[in-house]
Amino acid sequence: MVETKSIAPEFKKYLKFDSNNSNIRVGVAMSGGVDSSTVAYLLKQQGYDIFGVTMKTFKDEDSDAKKVCDDLGIEHYILDVRDEFKEKVVDYFVNEYMNGRTPNPCMVCNRYIKFGKMLDFILSKDASFMATGHYTKLKNGLLSVGDDSNKDQVYFLSQIEKNKLSKIIFPVGDLEKTKLRELAEQLGVRVYSKKDSQEICFVDDGKLKQFLIENTKGKAEKPGNIVDKNGNILGKHKGFSFYTIGQRKGLGISSEEPLYVLAFDRKTNNIIVGQNEDLFRDELIATRLNLFSVSSLEGLDNLECFAKTRSRDILHKCLLKKDGDNFQVKFIDNKVRAITPGQGIVFYNNDGNVIAGGFIEK
């Protein structure tokens, strides 16, 4: 138990002990970072019977998670998911880049690994719930945006199967990250000042090109031409797997005006570039939709809602039109910049609840 006298009044509500919680077993997904570590402290203080679980994925697991569990006097398990992670996340990641698409590995990992294999493991340990440090809420059984707009992670969780949400809790969804760090420091969490993890956990910062070369046995290096919209050759590229829609830096071409990657032509192996205004589109095709607030794809047809095409995007008003198993998404009030095939697209209602999540096809 933590001495709560040293805790600021604004945080006291997170530390209320309830003896009834001792009968509720919760597995905490622990990365070794400040978010999940603070979740473990809060649930322990609230009286839950908790244990920590850390996944062994592509790299060695973070030892800080074990240290935090030792500080709390709770069990810590290491779940080896290397084979599944390689198949479901890493191979997918590489294949998407090789096909001229920009993958979203966090979405895929959350569906199959974290809220798939890890959730199953936690429930097998007689736990009633799995807790994570995501800045997200559950409202009426649906995913909903967290209070910190800069850290809201519901976008990355939009591929979780709906029937699993009843087994998941997000204890810090109504906290801002800066406030969580303050609380963590006051609680004495050893990692309260630890830096946030990098976006792609299995690729070292600045080493994406090297990673793709190594994991494709050099096939990612497939030189071709950089052309304008009229097909005029402006320069050379070393392989379109190393580029993404909207990219400006690193093209190695000179122009009076800045040029950006607009598209990839797999047949010719060309990268097509243009000006910034050429990046704006008023529609896209969404595929592989995961449903939350509707029970069938037909429930989305002719639906007016809001969409995000990247995690820190603003909400764009849109209209959905069913097209087989896919959907045409028509943006109503404004065009959207740098729509990127392979990235996620998430649909929200007026209350910030997730209606469905999918991927951008084109």
From Swiss-Prot:
Binding of ATP, residues: A29, M30, S31, G32, G33, V34, D35, S36, M55, G133
Location of the protein in the cell: Cytoplasm
Active site residues per record: C109, C201
A GO MF term: tRNA-uridine 2-sulfurtransferase activity
Gene Ontology CC, one term: cytoplasm
Residues of the site described as Interaction with tRNA: H134, Q343
Region (Interaction with tRNA): 151-153
Catalytic activity: S-sulfanyl-L-cysteinyl-[protein] + uridine(34) in tRNA + AH2 + ATP = 2-thiouridine(34) in tRNA + L-cysteinyl-[protein] + A + AMP + diphosphate + H(+)
UniProt-listed SUPFAM superfamilies: Adenine nucleotide alpha hydrolases-like
Protein name (database record): tRNA-specific 2-thiouridylase MnmA 1
Organism (species): Fusobacterium nucleatum subsp. nucleatum (strain ATCC 25586 / DSM 15643 / BCRC 10681 / CIP 101130 / JCM 8532 / KCTC 2640 / LMG 13131 / VPI 4355)
Gene name as annotated: mnmA1
